[in-house]
Amino acid sequence: MSTRDTPYVAVIGASNATEWELETAARLGTLLAESGCVLVCGGLGGVMDAAARGCGEAGGISIGILPGDGRALASPHLTVAIATGFGEARNAIVARSADAVIAVGGEFGTLSEIALALKMGTPVVGLGTWELGRDDLDRDPIVRAETPEAALAELRRLVPTFGP
């Protein structure tokens, strides 16, 4: 499969994550690698590091889109670390680079990535993350999952290029 056909999935969440969020992100990284996906993340600690670690341990490829000018603070588990110098604006690159986004917990940076992805038409699956709603929406635009396995099942339903 060429990189044009390979699904890119962003795993997003906070750098100061809970133990559950870290375990969930690591499991997601493993499952994505085993499914042949490329993991995209913000490249730093917490959920980002845990997802990259799980991906790497399963032999997968992970790309970190870093906010700073250098790679010194990048997760050591990344396959590729890209220093943007864009600060939080790098969230747009994370959202744009992915065919789908999985949000695990998270704070305001995660919320911005969710909003950007949804605005771009990219599906978002959430595990213990923000709930969004407005009076004119009949449902939360984030597809909910309780486990990493359920999140991948939703990806298979939502993303045509996502394999079996």
Model-found features: residue ranges?
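Short, low-complexity, intrinsically disordered N-terminal peptides in bacterial proteins
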Residues: 1-6, 162-164
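Generic N-terminal amphipathic, Lys/Arg-enriched alpha-helix
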Residues: 4-19, 29-35
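Acidic/glycine-enriched connector segments
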Residues: 23, 27-30, 45-120, 128-132, ...
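A short beta-strand-loop structural module common to alpha/beta enzyme folds
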Residues: 38-45
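Short acidic-hydrophobic, aromatic-tinged amphipathic segments that line or gate anion-handling sites
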Residues: 81-85, 125-127, 142-154
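A charged, well-structured terminal subsegment
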Residues: 96-101, 145-164
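Acidic, glycine-centered active-site loop in nucleotide-sugar glycosyltransferases
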Residues: 137-141
